[in-house]
Amino acid sequence: KYTDDELGTAIIADEVVREGFTYRMYNPNTGEHTFTKNPIEVIGNVSLGWNHEEDADFPAFGYDMDGSVPVYRLYSSATGLHHYTMDREEAMWDVEALGFDFEGVVFFALPADATEGSLVYRLYNPYDYQHLWTTNKGEYDYLGSIGWNQEGVAFKVQ
């Protein structure tokens, strides 16, 4: 492991891991995207064939900050997919009605109506039932043009 304290980054197994970021990974075999703040999970998933989409990483809080809200991560062993939501009721419905496992808070973000922060958009693919978050407006617009449902701004990040 190499750490560059000046940049706040670590390079582990040729992967750049930036402190304070939420990492986006893509599984080319399933089409799933997943998000984590855990650099060990990034390294493990990359070793299993996932792509770390470094350009899609975004800064997020690893702990509750004044005005922040939790983002929950759930997993369906039936489909092998993760689901993310800031809505506690949606998370509990996924657990009770759909059989998802509740994996807890993955990070904290600012609510969509916060006066500061960068926009994070949420999309839904009706063909494979997956959600995706992106800070890239071009990606959001493109995916909307090819059939993804654009759900608007989900939250904001620093």
Q: What label would you give each PLM region?
A:
Residues 1-158:
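Extracellular glycan-binding segments that recognize GlcNAc-based cell-wall polysaccharides
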